A protein has these predicted regions:
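Cytosolic juxtamembrane N-terminal segment immediately preceding the first transmembrane helix
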Residues: 1-42, 57
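Extracellular/periplasmic helix-loop-helix junction of adjacent transmembrane segments
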Residues: 51-80, 119-121, 320-325
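12-transmembrane solute porter fold
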Residues: 27-50, 63, 139, 182, ...
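Structural signature of transmembrane alpha-helices in multi-pass secondary transporters
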Residues: 34, 41, 70-73, 77, ...
Length: 483
């Protein structure tokens, strides 16, 4: 059985640095279902933000209940993304992709029919979350394998990450339109219809490698890593209810994560294949880029939840009004994404990521200052536009730096880790910023400001991490994978 790296080096999917080489038309058509899959998964993570009031009233729950459903969805994605990536070798990349789509679709329909919060969490958070964890790793692995020259691959990654950012930013607008025109349940039916269309489009997908059922799978590592992440994030969610429970869950989560890495080291010393190789954490450039990637999604989802909840719960805006305000962020991300390739030709990856953080932080400051001085909902638009531009400028460069820090044979592993880190950032953004907001709803203006200040401080950490990246960070893989 040839490995992923062997096929890329020796087979018809041979790697080339020829900037003129272009993928064939059939290969370019394969990008459509992959990009749509990333779009709908990102959309699912943000569209519920504008339904907070509608869902809480219809299901007789609270704002915190809806926050929990959103956070658990993002958390399940993060917790199972690496195991999902490992299963692609065992089951096949296309098979995992389609299975994930089917599970996601079932979860969307179950959510649409949910009679209460429990079924909503089962359908949206669990089924859709696990489905996403199965289908997203193949998106990035297949893109790496099918787009074999560096220029077309960078362009393909730009399309996919751009669609992810647009899905996350457009989620409130589309979700708001559907919720106001029909019902919040129709938004989940919309997701199921898009997923069905992707399943049809994926019939033309080709998997360059056959599945290998003998590929080892580290079940213990999967349980330890997933349980650790779940405990940490759920502990953060409990901070406004019981600090002792929160501290206990976070402590257990940290112990489980430490136990996971000890387990991985033991597996490697025994010559066995762990869930995640420790080699992935020995690359300083990749580590820094992963930090920036995590914080980018933390800021995007944190700002989306805080602004959406504040507009609906405090200002009394409905779903469509809230969604329309978020068109500013959507326009910013879309505009910056369209310019990403041109900017990458003129500036280093580090410069783009640093600039993105500076613009995003400026947007958060504007959100703080204008909202305090101006009661109109449009006071949010300038800040959201800046945040969209900043995030759109740096989402693709961060992915490029991470993926390019490793040789071809490690692309599957680093892709899974990269997606896990991004989704963990999304869940932390909703959990941390949302908890700061919800805990102080008795004094909403103060709690809104506190949540934004927390996000700004985290954004500063991302700016520092990006400044530490090598000045020549590029999209060219190193020979050894270590820098």
């Amino acid at each position: 059985m040839q490995s992923f790296g062997d096929v890329l080096r020796d087979g018809k999917y041979e790697m080339t640095d020829n900037p003129v080489a272009r993928p064939s038309a059939p290969v370019r058509r394969m990008l459509l279902p992959l990009a749509l899959a990333q779009f709908i998964c990102s959309f699912a993570g943000s569209n519920m933000n504008v339904m907070i009031n509608d869902i809480s009233v219809d299901l007789d729950t609270t704002v915190q209940g809806v926050q929990t459903a959103i956070t658990v969805f993002l958390l399940v994605m993060a917790a199972f993304m690496i195991p999902g990536g490992k299963l692609t070798d065992r089951w096949g990349r296309k098979r995992c992709f389609v299975a994930g789509l089917v599970l996601y679709g079932v979860g969307a329909l179950l959510s649409a029919a949910a009679p209460g919060l429990g079924i909503l969490i089962l359908g949206n958070s669990i089924f859709e979350g696990i489905g996403t964890a199965l289908l997203i790793p193949p998106v990035y692995i297949l893109t790496t394998m099918l787009f074999t020259d560096m220029k077309s691959r960078a362009r393909a990654f730009g399309v996919i990450t751009g669609m992810g950012g647009i899905g996350a930013a457009a989620g409130p607008l589309i979700g708001g339109l559907i919720t106001t025109a029909i019902d919040w349940r129709a938004a989940f039916v919309f997701q199921a219809l898009i997923v069905a269309a992707i399943v049809v489009l994926s019939r033309g997908l080709e998997d360059p490698l056959p599945p290998d059922p003998t590929t080892p799978f580290d079940g213990i590592g999967a349980v330890l890593s997933a349980a650790g992440l779940v405990c940490i994030v759920m502990g953060i969610l409990q901070a406004d209810n019981a600090l002792s429970v929160s501290a206990t869950l976070i402590g257990i989560g940290i112990l489980l994560v430490v136990g996971f890495f000890l387990h991985v080291r033991r597996f490697e010393r025994a010559g066995r294949v762990p869930l995640l190789s420790t080699d992935l954490f020995r690359n300083r450039t990749s580590n820094l880029a992963l930090v920036t990637q995590n914080i980018q999604w933390l800021l995007l989802m944190g700002v989306a939840f805080v602004v959406s909840a504040f507009l609906q719960v405090v200002r009394g805006y409905n779903a469509i009004e809230t969604g329309v305000i978020f068109t500013a962020a959507t326009a910013g991300i879309l505009g910056a994404s369209l310019l990403a390739e041109r900017l990458a030709d003129r500036h280093s990856q580090r410069a783009l990521i640093m600039s993105g953080f500076v613009v995003t932080l400026a947007g958060i400051v504007v959100l703080l200052l204008l909202v305090r001085a101006w009661t109109s909902a449009w006071a949010f638009a300038p800040g959201l536009l800046l945040i969209g531009v900043g995030l759109g400028a740096m989402l693709t460069p961060s992915v490029n730096v991470v993926q390019s820090a490793f040789p071809e044979e490690q692309q599957g592993e680093i892709s899974g880790l990269s997606r896990c880190v991004s989704n963990l950032g999304s869940s932390l953004g909703t959990a941390v910023a949302g908890t700061v907001l919800v805990v102080g709803l008795a004094t909403p203006n103060r709690s809104y400001a506190a949540a934004m200040i927390v996000l700004a401080c985290i954004g500063l950490v991302g700016l520092v991490a990006s400044a530490l990246l090598p000045a020549t960070s590029s999209a060219t893989p190193s020979a050894s994978g270590a820098q």
